[in-house]
Amino acid sequence: MTNKPSAATGRNVVVVGTQWGDEGKGKLVDWLTEMSQGVVRFQGGHNAGHTLVINGVKTALHLIPSGIMRPGVKCYIGNGVVLSAAKLFEEIEGLEKAGVEVRSRLRISEACPLILPFHAAIDIARETFREKGGTEKIGTTGRGIGPAYEDKIARRALRVQDLKYPERFAAKLRELLELHNFVLTGFLNAPAVDFDTVYNEAMLHAELLKPMMADVSRELNDAHQAGANLLFEGAQGTLLDVDHGTYPYVTSSNCVAGNAAAGAGVGPGMLHYILGITKAYCTRVGGGPFPTELDWENPGTVGYHLSSVGAEKGVTTGRSRRCGWFDAALLKRSAQVNGLSGLCITKLDVLDGIEELKLCTGYELDGQTTDILPMGADDIARCVPIYETMPGWSQTTVGVTEYDKLPAAAQRYLQRIEEVTGVPVHMISTSPDRDHTILLRNPYAA
């Protein structure tokens, strides 16, 4: 494995989560970066949370691509990302304190919409308003992601490039703040956001951002032509996609592989291999339907085992993740909308010691059976899972790096996932550590 580009055009891999996020994408992106020269974020914002464990040291990233932990690898934030400059510099400073060089290796698209303080204020006020009104909360992270995307779609967003022109920025900000303060004070019963505070902070960030501003689309295309291997790092998961997820309990961007092209400024022909990251069981943070959910709060239950052994706490919010059995019918939907080339099964080791495993292969819905997850939260909430029961294993799989050394029951479990979903398993993760990975087929050589 090497970080040197090939003589011909590079080969590019897209990494996406196939469930509700938190599948372990960060570790796999970091691992695959050993074979790439550039890592690209193409959607979401600092609502994402990627945890890397390298030589026993845990690092949490929210906005900066996971490839930053590999010396010499360039990292790109594409136009599909909504950018909080405040959170970006908080993250940069934390990495620099740990001895990681960031600023010379990070390129930020000038077309990124900005997340500003009033976006988070609206996000939080809306969730409070829903709760007081007796409506179930969406379960947002409260970081302003949704409101920032709303401004983008409404064609009124302030973008990174606007920071280069203070007078233009001020005029746009004043107009935008007038609208949002009207909503905050007149509808959501929340305090107004001060113009000067927002403007002055933005101008401080502008000077720091300027050296990293770039035409990311052009740089990625040039790097590809020069032979660089690129890795497109998805955030959240397919079932949180604004179109294909459990709507309305979703995020505000497209999390599927196809958005790697639009969110980074490359053609779809540059996406050569799609790797779907999938936990060996299911988890979900926040509200919304979850067909295979177990009792994960009471000791002695399988769900509690998954929650405690899997350390299922959200990286971004610290909220406990809901836990349940593996859902192959859900994964079949994810495979369809992403065009998956292969799977990486993570957290296989968490299943160690569970005597009997269940795998959902379909659902009963309104008197009918279906072998694929329906569209939309209302139908999914009415689904009754159809399970296959499989034997578990008592041997430890922690740190196993060869497929043949996995227990026979673990191998059969993985094979059944392949059979039901129609997608081959190409990688398996057996602990959070970077090196505890089984490689069956290299995405960069496939």
UniProtKB/Swiss-Prot annotation:
| Record: residues binding substrate | V315, T316, T317, G318, R319, S320, R321
**Catalytically driven reaction(s):** IMP + L-aspartate + GTP = N(6)-(1,2-dicarboxyethyl)-AMP + GDP + phosphate + 2 H(+)
Predominant location: cytoplasm
UniProt keywords, alphabetically: Cytoplasm, GTP-binding, Ligase, Magnesium, Metal-binding, Nucleotide-binding, Purine biosynthesis
Where is the catalytic site?
A: D22 (proton acceptor), H50 (proton donor)
Recorded metabolic or biological pathway in which this protein acts? Purine metabolism; AMP biosynthesis via de novo pathway; AMP from IMP: step 1/2
Chain positions recorded as Mg(2+) binding sites: D22, G49
**UniProt entry tagged with the keyword Cytoplasm:** yes
* UniProt subcellular location: Cytoplasm
Q: What class of enzyme is it?
A: ligase
Protein role: Plays an important role in the de novo pathway of purine nucleotide biosynthesis. Catalyzes the first committed step in the biosynthesis of AMP from IMP.
Summary of subunit composition and partner proteins: Homodimer.
Q: Which family does it belong to?
A: Belongs to the adenylosuccinate synthetase family.
**This protein's name:** Adenylosuccinate synthetase
Give the organism, scientific name: Polaromonas naphthalenivorans (strain CJ2)
Q: Gene symbol?
A: purA
